[in-house]
Amino acid sequence: MTYRVLRLAGGRPIISPRMFESIGAPEDGTSINGPSVIRLPEWLDASRRVHPSARYYLYFSHHNGWYIRMAWSADVAGPYHLYQPETIHRAGRGVFELPEVAGARRLQFGNGVVVHGHVASPDVHVDHRNRRFVMYFHGITNTT
């Protein structure tokens, strides 16, 4: 079997530091890691998408950041548009953020696991049976 690699968008990055520079957050464009692209399922109505023409969501992060970012596109090759760029300078940015608690970034889950410091490398899957998205990510935890 022979495989062929095809670069999208003419070989240009689909997410670039310039996107963050254009919204006044150049530091957020210094590390763009762990991309995960999903094609939106037919069962997700256009009214529930971040934009009616959105067909693809791209999840990514800063390797040492405290939030998971997202961009959307009508075509897998782009152009991609940052999700909620107006929130980049305040709490609640991206699609998942470690909240600041007593001066530290941390989140405690119901099972006692605490994620702190940073989150990165989102791996998003569509669970068609339960009609939901499932995100895995890495971060520092209190478990061994």
Question: Where are each of the predicted segments found?
Answer:
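Beta-rich carbohydrate-recognition and catalytic domains
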Residues: 1-121, 125-144
